[in-house]
């Protein structure tokens, strides 16, 4: 046993169960195969079938859900629309997830975002509707001013095969008329409390047997732990999964050991100094765009055309 491995076993607490919040309820999930996607877990394990599979590659937006995740650069919780078809479930440890089924009140009263779609007749065949609703809900959570350009950005990652975009955009404009101070945040307060408290939990380290192989997923919280795993094993480094997710969903590759860097505090730092910018390996395109746009005006339009909001929310600049 190496000195580093001995240190890890003695001083770094680890666990194998995934802990997350789903539609306001805490879920404790026993070890799962590391490449189980969030979408498949929602549909097959939780029977939340509003989340649809359209393309299985993060392009169509039918699988869109909203996640709350801690942002080390802002030192708060950020809310993002993401493609659940290419996100692996263990990546969501410590996060809060909202699906379309979780928007209405317990009494069955529709969320204002859902009402906007109803009142503006913004659904035709309905297959894409949950994804559009969740993208608009992400804009609601972010308290964004939804002018025409912002609406286009918000829905850039959602496709409607019926081409019913006009009433969909009208629904978004309708939401913009609701004052920010009138938008409910009470239940999100509980979600944010859960996310922050999770930062103090043990590191996630999942090991399961599959086809005579051990499948492993490590999600260290500190750089020392990350380096130890990297140097003592031969893991595949996983950041946002916007490429690796397709290796699983499209190429059907069997991947045996993920080393996830999304929880490593030191790799989630963005610093500006006299020499330029120091961009951590876990910094997403969305965060980098917010930090650098004022310095590089010409990059603003380029970044808007890079992927979609769902992709920029998880895809990393460093790769």
Q: Which positions does each model-derived feature cover?
A:
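Signature of N-terminal electron-transfer/Fe-S-associated modules in redox systems
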Residues: 2-224, 265-267, 273-278, 283-284, ...
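Aspartyl protease active-site motif detector
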Residues: 53-56, 235-245
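A gly/ser-rich beta-alpha-beta helix-loop segment of oxidoreductase catalytic cores
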Residues: 66, 155, 239, 244-246, ...
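Glycine-rich loop at the start of a catalytic domain that most often binds anionic cofactors/ligands
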Residues: 66-70, 81-82, 247-261
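A glycine- and small-aliphatic-rich helix-loop capping segment at beta-alpha/alpha-beta transitions
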Residues: 143, 177-179, 251-260, 293-297
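Noncatalytic alpha-helical scaffold of FAD-dependent oxidoreductases
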Residues: 209-210, 214-235, 252, 311, ...
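General beta-strand structural signal in soluble alpha/beta enzymes
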Residues: 218-219, 236-240, 260-261, 279-281, ...
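Acidic, glycine-rich loop-and-beta core segments that form the ion-binding/anion-interacting portion
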Residues: 233, 244-249, 256, 263-268, ...
């Amino acid at each position: 046993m190496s000195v580093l491995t001995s240190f890890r076993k003695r001083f770094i607490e680890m666990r194998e169960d995934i802990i997350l919040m789903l539609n306001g309820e805490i879920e404790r999930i026993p070890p799962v195969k590391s490449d189980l996607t969030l979408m498949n877990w929602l549909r097959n394990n939780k029977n939340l079938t509003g989340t649809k599979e359209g393309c299985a590659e993060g392009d169509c937006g039918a699988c869109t859900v909203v996640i709350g995740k801690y942002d080390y650069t802002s030192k708060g919780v950020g809310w993002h629309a993401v493609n659940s078809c290419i996100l692996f479930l263990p990546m969501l440890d410590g996060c809060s997830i909202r699906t379309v089924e979780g928007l209405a009140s317990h009494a069955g009263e529709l969320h204002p975002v859902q009402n906007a779609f109803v009142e503006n007749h913004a659904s035709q065949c309905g297959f894409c509707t949950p994804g559009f609703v969740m993208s608009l809900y992400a804009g609601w959570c972010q308290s964004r001013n939804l002018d025409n350009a912002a609406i286009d950005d918000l829905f850039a990652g959602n496709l409607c095969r019926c081409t019913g975009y006009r009433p969909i955009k009208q629904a978004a404009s309708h939401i913009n008329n609701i004052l920010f101070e009138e938008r409910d945040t009470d239940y999100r307060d509980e979600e944010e409390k859960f996310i922050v408290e999770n930062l103090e939990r043990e590191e996630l380290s999942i090991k399961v047997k599959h086809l005579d192989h051990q499948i492993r997923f490590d999600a260290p919280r500190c750089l020392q732990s990350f380096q130890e795993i990297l140097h003592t094993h031969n893991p595949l480094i996983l950041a946002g999964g916007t490429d690796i997710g397709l290796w699983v969903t499209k190429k059907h590759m069997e991947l045996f050991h993920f080393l996830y860097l999304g929880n490593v505090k030191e790799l989630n730092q963005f610093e500006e100094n006299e020499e330029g910018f120091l961009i951590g390996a876990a910094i997403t395109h969305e965060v980098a765009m917010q930090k650098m746009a004022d310095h590089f005006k010409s990059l603003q339009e380029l970044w808007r055309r890079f992927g979609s909001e769902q992709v920029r929310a998880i895809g990393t600049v460093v790769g």
